[in-house]
Structure formats: C-alpha cells, structure tokens
Amino acid sequence: MESKSGRFPFPFQPYPIQESFMEALYTALDQRKVGIFESPTGTGKSLSLICGALTWLRDYEEQRKQEAARLLEGQKDSDVVKEKNSNSGPPEPDWVSEFVQKKAERDMVNKLKDEELKRKKREERLEMIRHNAQLRYAMKRKADEDDEAVKLLQLSREGAEPETHSPEEEGLIVAEYESDDEATPKSRLCDDDNDDDDDLEEEHVTKIYYCSRTHSQLAQFVHEVQKSPYGDAVRLVNLGSRQNLCINPEVVRLGNVQMMNERCLEMQKNKHEKRQKASDSESKRSRGLAKATCVFSRFENLMAMKDEVLVKVRDVEQLIQHGRETHTCPYYSTRMSIPAAQVVVLPYQSLLHASTRKASGIKLKDQIVIIDEAHNLMDTISAIHSAEISGGQLCRAHSQLSQYCERYRSRLKAKNLMYIKQILFVLEGLVRTLGGKVGQNPNTQSCQTGSELLTINDFLFKAQVDNINLFKVQKYFEKSMISRKLCGFAEKYEGSGINTHSSSKNKENRRTEGLGRFLQTLQSKPTDVSEQQMAVEDKPIMASPMMLAESFLFALTNANKDGRVVIQRQACVAQSSLKFLLLNAAVHFAQILQECRAVIIAGGTMQPVADFKEQLLFSAGVTEERILEFSCGHVIPPENILPIVLCAGPSGQQLEFTFQTRDSPQMMEETGRVLSNLCNIVPGGVVCFFPSYEYEKRILGHWESTGILQRLQSKKKIFQEPKKASQVEQVLSEYSKCIQRCSNIGGGQTGALLFSVVGGKMSEGINFSDDLGRCIVMVGMPYPNIKSPELQEKMAYLDKHMPHVAGKSPGKALVESLCMKAVNQSIGRAIRHRGDYACIVLCDHRYARTGTLQKLPEWIRSSTHTHATFGPAFASARRFFLEKRQKATL
C-alpha cells in the first residue's frame, strides 16, 4: 500500500501526520538539512523514518543512474565530434583550460563506468546468493565440515605440551616505535594476498546510518524494517559490539567488553603473524603450541558472509545464528559489509565517538545520519567523551606498567622506554592529586575528603605533568597498543607467583611473581554481601586498568575551555577518583554535521529545542537556514487525553514542592490525599512519579506512619520501581497481571499503583499503554541538584559562552530544560495508540507558568487545563473516566 500522495510505500494507509512526517523528512534529506523531528510515542515514528528515508534513497539512486547514463551517452557523442574536428585548424588560445575541462570530464566518465561495473557485479553476486539455494546448502555443508575439523583440532591440543616461555612472551613486548611514523598498519583481517581485489577496494555507496540508545531499540527498528515494504530489497547491516556479536567461546566467556576486545584483537594479531611466518615454518620446525587464533575469522568465510549479510535483513540474534551455522564471525563480517550497505544500524557509541567510528570502518562523507531517541543527545555526547578513573585503578596501572618495564627493559627500544617512563610519570602525578603515592597500597592510604573542580590546564599544573606532551603520549598509546600488551601481561601473571620453564629466567621471575599478589591487595574487598553483589553487577574488574588511564589521558587533550576535571577525595586513595567532564558537546558533534549530507535528530519529545539548537547546532557552525524543524501532534483524538495542572490539594493547601516546603508534613499529607482521591476514580493502573529516590523514600515513610499508604492499598495494589535493572521486568509483569486480574474479577481493588522516580528505570523506554497507565501523576518538578559541582560548572560555561535569551541566563535555562525534558519523558509514555486514553496530573502550581507550559509537547500543551483548586480538577477527571466507561459499554 502507498500513501495518499502515492509517493511513499507503506504497509498500511498512513495517518496524515505520518505523511507529513515523511514529506518533511524527504525534503530534509534532499536539501541537505539538519532536521529536528518530534513525533510522540505511539505515532509510528520508526516506520515513518524507514519509509520516508528509504524512498528518498531509492529516488536518489535512480537519479544517479540516469545521470550516469546521460554522461556516458554524452561521452560517446563527444568522441564523434572530436573525430570530426581532429583535422581542423590550430587550437584556440584557451586550449589549456579546454584540455583541463576535457580531462576532468574523462575522469568523471571513467569513475562512473567503474562505479557502474562494481554496482552490477555486486547486484549479480547478491542476486545469485539470494536465489541459489544449492549454493547456500553447499556453504552450510562446508561449514559443518569445518566444525568437525575445529573439534578435532581442539581435541588434539588438549594433550599437547604447554608452549615454551620465550615465544609466548614475544607477543607481550611492544614493537619498535618511531613517533613520527604516520604509516597506517595493514588490516589484520586480510588473509588474501590479492591486494587489488575489487571487493577490498569497494567504495561506500550513499547510505543511511541509523543509531539509537539501546540494543533493544535497534532490534525493534530492524523488525520494523523487516515488516516494511522495503524489507525484502534493502541491504541492511546491523552493527554491534563484540559483546553482542562474538561467537568465539574463548572470547565470550570473558564477559567484560573491554577484555573481549583485547582478546579478539590479540587473536587477529596472532593470525596475521602466523601468515607472515608461514614460509619460515617450512624450513624451521616450530616448538610448542601455536598462539591462539580465531577459527571464525577465515578470510574466505568472512567474504562469503559479508554478502550473505546484505541479502537478507537480520537482527543481532539472527546474525549470531547465521554465524554459528557458517562458522563465521558476525562482528567482522558485518563491518566488511558496510561499504555496500544501504542502511547501517548501530548504537550511539559507534557513531558519536570518532575513534570507534574509525575503527568500525564508518565513513560519513556525504552520507545520511538519523539519530533516534535523541532527547538526551547532548548529555549522551558528553557522557561518551567524559572519563573517570579511581585511585585504585591508577595505582594498579602504575604497578603493572612498572613491572612490565622492569621485566622487559633489556628488550625494549629507547623510544619505548622513554614513552613508558613518561606514562609512569603522568600516572604518578595523577595519584598525587588524590593525596596518594604510587607503590603503596591505596586501600590503606588515607586522604582528606572533599571535592575540587579545575580547568584542564590547572589540573595538569597541579599534577605537575604540564611539561608532558599528551598528544604524543596519546599517539604512542594508539600505535604501540601498550594497553593491550599490558592486559596480556597482567592476565599471564595475575594470581599466585609464577615459575617459568627456563631456569635461566629466575631473576626475571622474581621481579614479577609478586605482581598478582600485589594487584589483589589493591582491589577493595567489601565485606557486606549486598555490597559485593552490587560491585559485581555495576563495576566489573578489568584486566588492564591502563585502558581506563588511556581514556582519561585522551580526554585531557580537549581544549582547556571545553572541559573540567573533578577531583573527588574519599576516605582512602583507592576510593577517590578523577573525572573529566565535557562541557562543550558541539566540539565532538561538529565533524558529523560537517561531513554528512544530512543529519536527522528525532525523538518522541524533543521539547524544549531552543537550547538544543544553541548549544549543539549553532555552536558547531550550523546556520539557521540549514535547520528544518518538524513537530506533529498525536494520532489520538483530543478528547482521549486530559492533562491537568493542579495548583492545590483537597484541603486548599497550595502544591509547591520546593526544597524548603516539600518535606513539610502538611505537603506530604496533601499529596497523599490527592493521590487517594484519584485512585478512587481511575480504573486500571496509576503511575506516580517522584522527583528523586530520596524523596520517594521520605514521603512513603510518612504515608506509612500516618495510614495514607493503607488507604491507597485498599483501592490499588502498590508496586514500587526497583533500583536494579534486572528486576524491572518482574515488577512490570506483576503490575500488569494485577491490573488484568482486577479488571476481570472486580472486587475492592480496582487496579494497581506504581511508584516510580523521574529518570529512573520506569520513566524512559517503558510504555504504559491502555490499562497500565490510565493516570500519570507527576509530584513536583524534578529539577537537578543545583549544588552539584558538575552542573554549576556547566551553567557557568553556558553563561560565559552562550547568548542570553529573553533576559534569562543560559545556565538557568539549562536547569529548566533538564527538568522539563525529564517530565516530558515520564508523561509521554502514557499514550501508545489511537484508541488509548489517559489523564496526566501535574502536581505543582509552578507548572501553570507560561514559560513552563511552553516546554510541554504541543499535543499535551494544547489540551492542558490549569485548576487553582482541587474540586474542579477532580470533577473533570471523574467526568473524563465516566465518559470513557460509558463509551466502552456502547
């Protein structure tokens, strides 16, 4: 089915707002705009993005084909004219410019011919794979045979003797380093010596990069593509981390993504070295076991799966299944598929972080980027480019590198030693800023508690490392891969003391045998069982803390005005930390905006957008003319939503949840009375949002002691949002079952009441559709902690670098925007489809201010009613649900 205009293929007749969305999207892509698109949850935003963007891409590719055909035809005509004029008189005086023009035309035609040839070869190859079932069966049979071979190889290794000491340690030593060497290392993947293979030189076709926050959101998008009219024809690649796509058991068992990355890269390096030394093995027999390599990254298999990935749209689970069936790495094959793909689906980190982007093989020049769920884009960019490291991790990194240097000193070149000593010097300075000393147990080193916030330059002076060129140190980290070497070194020697096989190395062994024991003493050991569980869940230990140190040092290369360093001193050095805070997100987003043909920033609730444009777009050099804004209403009729600003409670108490008044018994009891009255008239589920966990704990404690909680329990079964993400699904399931049970059997309880926290597990990404959320209650205004040093510094930065609007400082505007974005995310989950309905109650008289109301989404703002007293508000809510019940019985 197509839209009414006939322009956009769609799986069903689209709503008018979806047509408008796709038209605006098409215009933005065609005119190279930066688009800000707001489409509420439940309006089919994902499908509109898919059909609108892929329709433009289809038209663009067709236009390119026609232009190429015209140019090629014109070249033939030009050759005929050139033959006729070959015997004419002497050349014109401007023959040089004419020659240059003709050469440019010939080059363009040759490029077009080359592109057309590659395109035809690619399409023929994919078509053959798509329709040749016999070929697919042969590939699967070959994979099964390979699987048997792998099992036999593993069995043969089990009885083999361990590798001798020397060859194993060879891989831990950094290669000779030349700081001015700019040569790009060759790919570790290529097992084929044919460098002029067409596939390896494949150019990137025009494509759409779609990114979102979570893997579940990306999976949902892929499923929408599969169901769309483009599902069978589009070439889509689903990128993920090794944690999501790796199928090698030896790597997967590590669990931690950083450790998985290091092990995988080490295996690729071993394979590369194995190929280089293949000729030597014929004349000289190798002793011991070969270094571990990955059996899933054979080049010919990767090339085959690269094409298979493009033939059919697959989500992550399907990619893993296909990789296991063909014994081929999905992680690398998907990256090899990027050049020919039309759509690349990837998480935020892979797109927004320049180093990750480069490592993934992503090229943004003249491409389309769509960033979905972008309401917190600035915060996301800041978080990705911020870095934090604890005193314990700094001490571990220094200890590991010191003992690494001591062990291999005689085998390290002068340049390597120089840079390693510089890194040790910097780490020592960083520990010193926390009040500690390297070489001592950070758990027993006490320091004066407190926090300090410094500019980058002031921090470097304080650490006494301002004489070190961090840009050269950063380059050394990248070229030498010292963090990875150190990871292998720590893994080899962690635990009990070591004994090498060669007696001549006993002196060296003594230098490192205490490493494992010392590293174990550096790790804090919480005695409380729950603390231990939280430590395991939230802070997995990495084999090489040097990776964290590398990230922190890289962050310090930002411009002085763009970031700050927070020094947080706790009771001991191990628990103290250094945190780099990025203040200017635009500096890292500018490259994306400059390189891409068009950038689409989409979300369910993008309001307020003024600060977004000022801080992220204008600061990155985008002009107002390049920005296209689109905001649509909801698919629901206006009578299906009742937003209420409630200024006072049943007893006439004004509702104002400021820091000074929110803890008063009168305010907490009045809030309980508001909620109790609402629970008496609202069917199904009521979701109540509090501004913080701390306030939720205080008010629930007060309600329990005054009997309010018992009154609420008589009408609604009470559920509370868990603090652990792993328990969210269970609570939601029980909450949903309770509402369904009450709806079916009736009784005293009419549903359930869910207490949640703004910015918590339930306020984002969870849809309270139908009976799950018939009423959303927002208690107070969730302003961020104004006393936070990070927020204060961000406000000061904006006040200094951003213009004042309507007499309001940018810092104050930031605080209000953070508050209202959090509100919009929480209340925007109530309506999920056209037939859904809900009441939204904003409990605080400050919501009635004009400036605050303007920051609500338009589809909510246009229906909002402000009530100075409780009576009329309660009457309108009761009438709203009564009408819905009567309509349902008709």
Swiss-Prot record:
Binds 1 [4Fe-4S] cluster. It catalyses: Couples ATP hydrolysis with the unwinding of duplex DNA at the replication fork by translocating in the 5'-3' direction. This creates two antiparallel DNA single strands (ssDNA). The leading ssDNA polymer is the template for DNA polymerase III holoenzyme which synthesizes a continuous strand; ATP + H2O = ADP + phosphate + H(+). Keywords: 4Fe-4S, Activator, ATP-binding, Cytoplasm, Cytoskeleton, Developmental protein, DNA damage, DNA repair, DNA replication, DNA-binding, Helicase, Hydrolase, Iron, Iron-sulfur, Isomerase, Metal-binding, Nucleotide-binding, Nucleus, RNA-binding, Transcription, Transcription regulation. Disruption phenotype: Morpholino knockdown of the protein leads to abnormal craniofacial and vertebrate development with shortened and twisted torsos, smaller eyes and low mouth positions at 3 days post-fertilization (dpf). Residues 71-95, 176-199 are annotated as: Disordered. DNA-dependent ATPase and ATP-dependent DNA helicase that participates in various functions in genomic stability, including DNA replication, DNA repair and heterochromatin organization as well as in ribosomal RNA synthesis. Plays a role in DNA double-strand break (DSB) repair at the DNA replication fork during DNA replication recovery from DNA damage. Plays a role in the regulation of sister chromatid cohesion and mitotic chromosome segregation. Stimulates 5'-single-stranded DNA flap endonuclease activity of FEN1 in an ATP- and helicase-independent manner. NCBIfam families: rad3. This is ATP-dependent DNA helicase DDX11. It comes from Danio rerio. The gene is ddx11.
